[in-house]
Amino acid sequence: MSTSTAHRARYVRPGTRGQDTEIIPFEADDGVPLTMLHVTRPGALTPRGPVLLVHGAGVRAEIFRPPLEHTLVDALLDDGFDVWMVNWRASIDLRPVAWTLDDAAAYDHPAAVRLVLERTGAPTLKAFVHCQGSTSFVISAISGLLPDVTTIVTNAVSLHTILPGWSSLKIRTLSPMVRRFSPTLSPKWGYKTEGPFSRMLRTTVVATHPECDNPVCAMVSFTYGAGHPGLWAHRNIDKATHDWIAGEFAGAPMTFFTQMRACVQAGHLVPTGDVPLIAPDLMAPPRTDARFAFLAGADNRCFLPEGQRRSFAHFDALSPGRHAHHEFPGYGHLDVIFGANAWRDTHPVIVDELRR
């Protein structure tokens, strides 16, 4: 893929048929600038109330609107939800900052929830959270910072951080070395390198990922997963989405990878200890009354589905029969959201859990 093609992909705004999108700037509780996207369908009623969509690391809110005929946003609007998508501090649409999961949990998510409730007048909301948007949102909920969130549907990872062997080896051994050369690790180096280290890494990664000719797809696999590719199955995504991916990933700071390294070593989320609002023991009984639904692709090679099984078991032991768990055969990490047949295989489960 040429640089020009990758840059063109960056500005695609798919999945917006009949939708209006209002972009609302706001600040996290520590002053970091964020944005909220309010997606509406003119004249449509929203009897199910507000739902907040929270993206993962190194992407942005638009990850929920790939170039598909039916996106998750479409499914939620069709079902009568009032859809809000936050660009928290990990978003590639914002000025890059060093961040940890604790920062997002303490400062971003409470501010985002507050904004939605203030704008809608609703007393509560529900949330669909993915990857590091999920881990940080769960930290926030466990710490008692999201009392107005009643349902949290979490995809891929939440309380327990279980990686494939190769990914575990990378984060334990390679991330400290990467930090010596770069403050970030970025899949966008697949089409735009930023110095000798990124060029060397890109050359190595592309040479060891011959499964497709999209260098960003290869870099995503190296950065976040263990597989060829690591975050989706090629059979599950169409060509337009595979091309679109080139513009939807950028860097994540090594401050995040350092915290995740500690979490992987522990097998569950571990706070940095630098943010007083965060509960010191995230395995203690959570300070939230929210109902959780834990989702995972059975073939996830970013975070193994075993992590979501353990998280469900943890919450189910505290409140038997209240929470839910689903695994999707044949799906991985992000194809749960933007797979070509996700409208049929995964989105109905997400919508159904948010209805409850």
Predicted regions and their residues:
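N-terminal cap/lid segment of alpha/beta-hydrolase-fold proteins
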Residues: 8-43
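Short, surface-exposed "cap/lid" segments of acyl-processing enzymes
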Residues: 28, 35-92
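Glycine-rich "HGGG/HGxG" loop immediately N-terminal to the catalytic nucleophile
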Residues: 84-100, 333-336
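Alpha/beta-hydrolase-fold enzymes
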Residues: 118, 122, 132-272
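Short beta-strand/loop motif that positions the catalytic acidic residue
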Residues: 288, 294-296, 300
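Conserved alpha/beta-hydrolase "acid-adjacent" motif
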Residues: 301-307
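Catalytic active-site module of serine/aspartate enzymes centered on a nucleophile-bearing elbow/loop
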Residues: 318-356
